[in-house]
Amino acid sequence: MALPNAAGEPAHRRALWAVLDTPWGQWPVIGTHLDHRFDESHVRQLQVDAISDLVLTLRNDPTADLPVLIGGDFNAVPDSDEIRRLTGRTAVKNRNVVFADMWELKGDGSGHTWSDRNEYLANANWPNRRLDYLFVTWPRPKPLGNPVRVWLAGVEPVGGVQASDHFAVVADVLTERSGDSNE
């Protein structure tokens, strides 16, 4: 799905989605990479709104269906308007579509995915920020999709090669329903 540019028109940034066949049922996942310019928060807000709209199409009943897992390079720090919009800390576009930040729930430390420990960022303008995320939608049947643990991958070079200029965020999530109410 093409994500909007500053004019609200489809642009080169994308959200790629799939519905995976799992032992627990059909599990929707989305991967994305939002605009990167420091001064384009307004564009990223349009882009996260488009992702919120996509989530609505992937779930028939948010209180019964498996939650949507969303990951990617959001190019925004946790207190930015676009991340606050996703996590319900400011007005959301769609009622019943809020995203829980897995690093915030179970990560350890700062979670910097754009780090000066990465050789590709030796001359970066603004290193040591958390720009990459894994989210799980709310509401959802408790505790489906809750992170058990969250960590960074690709932190160390392998065979002298750094995998990317960003570290990856990885999570183990709960896959069984508890029968409790949706909270």
Where are these predicted regions, by residue range?
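Metal-dependent phosphoester-hydrolase catalytic domains
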Residues: 56-68, 76-183
